[in-house]
Amino acid sequence: MPTFLAALLRAVLCLATLRAAMAAEPVAVILDHPRIFLTRAGLSALAARCAGAGAADYAALKRAADDAVRAGAIRWIDNKWAVPHDLLSCALVYLIEHQAGRPAQAYVDLIIRAWGDGTMIADQRGSAFGYHAIAYDWIHDALDPAQRRRYGDALGTWLTWYTGQAAITLQDGAWEYNQTWGPSHLNVMHSRDAITQKLLIALAIGGAGTAHQADAERFLASWATRIPNECIPAFDRMGGAWAESHGHGSYGPITVIPYAFEAWRTATGQNLFTAGRPWGFLPEMSHWLTWLRVPHTGRHAFIDDGGGDRYAGFASSAPLVARALRDPLAQWQALQARADGQYADGPWAALLIDPTVTASSPAQLGLPLAYLFAGAGNVFMRSAWDDPDATWAFFGAGPHFAGHQHDDEGHFLISRRGGLVGRGGGMGGNDEDFYWGGSLVFNLVTIFDPDEHPRRATRNENDGGLLRHVYEDQRCARGSITAYRDRATYTYSAADLTAGYAPAKARSVTRQFLYLRGRPGMDEYVVVLDRVVSTRAAFAKHFMLHVPAEPAQGGTVEELVPGHVARTSGVGLITTWLSRPDDFGPDAKVLSSGRSRMFMRTLLPAPASITRRGGEGHRNWGHPLEPTAQYDHTGPRRGEPPYCDWRLEVAAPLAEQTLFLHVFQIADEAVTTMAPVVLAEDAQAVRLEIGTVEQRWRVALAVSGDLGGSVTAPGMAEAEPLPVAVETRAQYAVDATPAP
């Protein structure tokens, strides 16, 4: 078990009564300033570090503050979409220079001039009110009593923002919704409850003699009660992956939730980072943001509406997570961020790195080669750490938590030396591009009921896919990982996806995903079995797969639209294509060497029909059976990364019950022939022999009942039964399946 999570588990067991104790005991905020991220007691050590080992970081910070003083202006303070980094740089330099006994008032005076009479702080048309609160706390002791009241009153007006109450209300959003917490710019846009901004303000102005003292106390009491008793259990259910979407997590929660929890810790001494379970959001966040990194670029995978970045907002909060949890993986990411220049615009964040926390990479920590984030139902797999040529894969199925979450249950991705299986290319917002809110950008099974009328159908017609819960705020069942196990030779996951489809068309939909971790480039395979039962045989079923490079089809190929659409039919069809190393776009440095090749063997249904569709004008086609959708659903950002220009559509003969069985081989580019695959079927299972005699895998997957089976690795005499339940002891030493 990873050392960090083992230690965290012990800490959690020791803190088993923390929630109840905190509910019973009033919470005291320290009297001194600063109290947000820093304390007066820690200033001496910080100043000493700035004069010693942290001199380079401090030089960058002071240079930014000095430039602002010389210019007489704080950059971006009027930009609603930007973080006013100079504001925090000046405030932090004041603290350090004052602690060192050097002149420091010029930094405070610049902030006072910018704030003026406080109107700009209180301007509800646009104000980075969360960052103003941090700066207020840091320069508090340099303000006279009148200034403290003036600016504190301006800040205090925000405590009832949007909700009309100085309390956590969860109005128009749950704990797992990004706008409940606030965006990374801590401004008014996309701020509903704005828990982070309001907490920072309540902590900053407490005791300053403002007219909002009672509101500040009410908000702190609300936090002290609701966070331990409601939020942390919700975060335990969700786990380390921000389930709403990676993109919306990076817009705010990945940054600002650690801000809130760390501000509470430094101001009260209560460490709520450790109040949850080891698989809760904050303890597991650094793992999720590590597993998201695809080896060939070192950047986060394009899983939903996010991806393509290396940190996704974690650069600013990683130092806080690292020191609150003594998390070596978060510390490793913070040091990487510093080396990558992530703190160039906001050098204040680098000074929050605690040098006493040991940094360790995934390989140094001995992290397993697969990981299940059980709450969101995210499974990540890879062949190795510290190898840009490694294989990486993702498979996902989980419940619907919050509004922006995409309906993509059963979706999977694979890469090696570039993308091999991706999601539909380009980017888009749920409002400007409804096609992006449907199923056809993901790799899943469609069941086409011609009478289905999906939500949000503008330029997003009936696609045969999942129910569209996007923008619904209530948690609901959609998909679930029912089995999971990781071994040195394989990673197995199974999911029940039935609840994700309309009951009028689907009786049962499951997917089994087996990654066979053989020798990279030679005998590495993925087996995918879909068991699909519809309510009517007439509801046609398709296996949809997005690939970045134009695939070559085996068998007799019928060109339907030359250069864009072609079809082949038969039994045991083989399709092949090359990886695309530049699938993340021209701004992403490719770390891997060469390319890889993927072979796909369609074993079931037999016979099957495979349509290859893509290229200019055909990348975003509607469902082939929907008459009103026969056009390219292009959008304003459809040409952006990730680049994934082709779709394979495997059509099954009409029947109520259909099995889709595919074997994917991940090979080196020079390999021209797929390894042998032999299929035998009986009433209980599909049975496969994969590979040459010397390196043969034997796999059995059940075709009814529990989603189990068996696997025999090359050289092994006995078959190992596959699990029918979730096994995560290698991650935590206890199973982490969240309660319903």
Model-derived segments and spans:
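Ser/Thr/Asn(+Pro)-rich, low-complexity disordered segments
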Residues: 174, 219-235, 251-264, 276, ...
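N-terminal leader/propeptide and maturation segments of large enzyme subunits in energy/redox metabolism
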Residues: 302-364
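Polysaccharide-binding surfaces and accessory modules of carbohydrate-active proteins
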Residues: 544-617
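Aromatic-lined, polymer-binding surfaces characteristic
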Residues: 34-285
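Boundary at the C-terminal end of the N-terminal hydrophobic targeting segment
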Residues: 20-24
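Catalytic and substrate-binding regions of extracellular carbohydrate-active enzymes
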Residues: 341-574, 642, 654-660, 666-670, ...
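Non-catalytic terminal regions with compositionally biased, polar/charged low complexity
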Residues: 518-522, 646-659, 665-740
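Sec-dependent signal peptide recognition
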Residues: 2-14, 19
